Regions:
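Active-site beta3 strand of CheY-like receiver
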Residues: 45-52
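Amphipathic alpha-helical coiled-coil "transmission" helices that mediate dimerization
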Residues: 124-146
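C-terminal output helix
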Residues: 107-116, 120
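Two-component/phosphorelay signaling modules centered on CheY-like receiver
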Residues: 11-30
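Active-site residues of response regulator receiver
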Residues: 8, 53, 83
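Acidic catalytic/metal-coordinating carboxylates
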Residues: 33-34, 60-66
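A Lys-centered signature of the CheY-like receiver
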Residues: 57, 105
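Alpha4 helix (beta4-alpha4-beta5 surface) of REC/receiver domains from two-component response regulators
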Residues: 19, 63, 75, 86-101
Length: 147
């Protein structure tokens, strides 16, 4: 099961994005109105995808990304930033801060699902590579112990 964290201070957006994620095979969403709550959750579990709003009270999406990327194991987790502000400067700042992709509101459902699905595929491939590297490392250690 792939875990998708959704962070948005607007409840209707959480409901919409969560319903869309449920359409994807083998996915479940973890919804948070507060970036702080999402960080607390992510500190103990590593999500496969994060969907975060750009503008939120208390902590914006940019600050969330910086804090999230500082968590152990979260440097490579794909992040999709969503905002009502579609100015190029906002996009650049979002991508420069560590977001992997960007969508402007109102979000096209088909495009949202396609981007989320692509990012989840990348996340699954990354995990498989990490597992394979760990296995190879253990095999090398076993082989060198014999020598």
């Amino acid at each position: 099961m792939q875990d998708v964290v959704i962070i948005d201070d607007t409840e209707i957006n959480l409901i919409l994005f969560s319903a869309l994620i449920k359409k994807l095979d083998n996915c479940r969403s973890h919804n948070f109105e507060s970036p702080i709550q999402a960080l607390d959750w992510a500190a103990t579990k590593q999500p496969d995808l994060v969907i975060v709003d750009y503008m939120m009270p208390g902590m914006d999406g940019l600050e969330f990304i910086q804090r999230f990327r500082a968590l152990e194991g979260c440097q490579e987790v794909p992040i999709l930033m969503i905002t009502a502000n579609d100015q190029k400067q906002v996009r650049y700042r979002a991508l420069d801060s560590g977001a992997n992709d960007f969508l402007a509101k109102p979000v096209d459902k088909v495009e949202f699902l396609a981007r989320a699905k692509n990012m989840l595929s990348l996340s699954a491939a990354r995990r498989k590579l990490a597992d394979r590297a760990e296995w190879l490392d253990s095999e090398v250690k076993k082989a060198t112990a014999v020598i």
